């Protein structure tokens, strides 16, 4: 199986059902890059390439993958299929669809049968999927946990700065800048 490799020894697998999902899923890759966590990224269709999905799930752990982020739209079976084939944590990213604005994708991923868990983030929220993957990895890798602490502190600082500006300027001036 040929996989687009960001690293020779990836810890996270980012997979998606179609290349049309890439504009959403790239946000997971960006976060992992920001944190210096190696990953791989590829396309696997649960419906069009089920053998590829099977092979990916079965071999992910032996390749060193520790968490899988799976994005899919519409019927969105990819995260569930992968979760049914591996003991690795799978994080599902529902991709917004034209027909139902992603509600179909969300429900397909959330409504897994007992015994086949898939952690699910908000529609099109690959960024949170990557942050959740980092929290999972942080259990084993203290340096990732420390980077997450700094990331959260930085978020807090930015919000506090914005709050101070708004309070000083008033809402009309704040919005006009």
Swiss-Prot record:
Alphabetized SMART domains for the sequence: AIRC (SM01001)
Keywords from the UniProt entry: Isomerase, Purine biosynthesis
Claim: Isomerase is one of the keywords in the record: yes
Reaction catalyzed: 5-carboxyamino-1-(5-phospho-D-ribosyl)imidazole + H(+) = 5-amino-1-(5-phospho-D-ribosyl)imidazole-4-carboxylate
Major enzyme class: isomerase
Gene3D superfamilies: 3.40.50.1970
Residues noted as binding substrate in the record, renumbered to the chain: 18, 21, 48
EC number(s) from the headed UniProt entry: 5.4.99.18
Protein family according to the UniProt entry: Belongs to the AIR carboxylase family. Class I subfamily.
Alphabetized PANTHER family for the sequence: PHOSPHORIBOSYLAMINOIMIDAZOLE CARBOXYLASE, PHOSPHORIBOSYLAMINOIMIDAZOLE CARBOXYLASE CATALYTIC SUBUNIT
Protein name: N5-carboxyaminoimidazole ribonucleotide mutase
Originating species: Pyrococcus horikoshii (strain ATCC 700860 / DSM 12428 / JCM 9974 / NBRC 100139 / OT-3)
Organism ancestry: Archaea, Methanobacteriati, Methanobacteriota, Thermococci, Thermococcales
